[in-house]
């Protein structure tokens, strides 16, 4: 016959196992939803970039967002970001098209994630107007979840291979 103490211990163990499993399932479901929302953020940014819409491209960043190009040129804050995108979209990247593919998403906290994105670009020109070779590289973004639930770019670093 099983003692009362053993029955209570088994009941508590089963309850804790079920509760933690349920909590894990809920957390995994939330992470899946957030991963999908982050991928949507990447897709919306890529779409704005390919339309050469400086305002919408910069609008994917938080107000004090930070950008660093493949050459190390930084832009900080909404006004600088929009000016940067306006300049490249009206000059050497005015005919460029890019493809961005999310490689990985790593949640640092429930509201902060690091995102690695493989990118490819065609149609670029050199600064003196000559056709540039196709390019590819890696973007590393830090994205943050806003109070609205929207994910936005906080830090953007770009490297070319």
How would you name each of these model-derived features?
Residues 9-21:
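Bacterial N-terminal signal peptides
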Residues 135-161:
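Short beta-strand edge/turn micro-motifs at domain boundaries
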Residues 127-133:
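A short acidic/glycine-rich loop-to-helix N-cap element
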Residues 32-41, 54-111, 116-118, 133-134:
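A solvent-exposed, acidic/Ser-Thr-rich amphipathic alpha-helical stretch
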Residues 50, 121-127, 143:
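Beta-strand elements of well-folded, non-transmembrane domains
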Residues 1-11:
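Bacterial N-terminal signal peptides that target proteins for export
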Residues 45, 51-53:
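Short helix-adjacent coil turns
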Residues 23-25:
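Boundary at the C-terminal end of the N-terminal hydrophobic targeting segment
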